[in-house]
């Protein structure tokens, strides 16, 4: 499907843009479409390179910089801001929310769009922490297995 017909897209539709294949999650999201890449765009990327207090915080993560590299490929003018809710799996809201142009899905977004998200050949990161620095070990992050289940792994595991 070409870019000019983006207004006609439906959840689950595939389209090509800027050399990547995308899957529509939400065809009417904040004036555009919310989409995810149809295939893994990178592999063996840790959430954070090293341990530090809060290394599972998306705002401070290594992977955030890797994801932000997609902005240059896609072009900032082709992106719309999105509020990412960094609430931990246990409900702790310490990490807050932030506005991003490119991002990993949260667990809540994964649950919402699960029916149209591709099952990748490897597990993928979300930006949802297991817990935050206010509740103990803040080094684990929620992931989605290749089979589609939500799991928790340490910030250093390699994938994506």
Language-model regions, residue ranges each:
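Collagenous Gly-X-Y triple-helix signature in extracellular proteins
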Residues: 1-158
């Amino acid at each position: 499907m070409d870019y000019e017909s983006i207004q006609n897209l439906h959840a689950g539709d595939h389209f090509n843009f800027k050399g990547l294949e995308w899957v529509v999650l939400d065809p009417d999201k904040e004036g555009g479409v919310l989409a995810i890449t149809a295939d893994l765009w990178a592999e063996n990327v840790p959430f954070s390179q090293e341990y530090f207090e809060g290394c599972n915080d998306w705002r401070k993560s290594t992977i955030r910089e890797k994801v932000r590299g997609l902005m240059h490929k896609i072009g900032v003018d082709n992106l719309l801001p999105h509020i990412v809710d960094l609430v931990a799996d246990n409900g702790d809201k310490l990490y807050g929310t932030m506005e991003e142009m490119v991002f990993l899905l949260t667990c809540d977004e994964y649950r919402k769009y699960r029916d149209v998200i591709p099952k990748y050949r490897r597990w993928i990161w979300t930006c949802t922490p297991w817990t935050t620095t206010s509740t103990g070990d803040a080094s684990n992050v929620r992931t989605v297995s290749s089979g589609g289940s939500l799991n928790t792994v340490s910030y250093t595991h390699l994938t994506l």
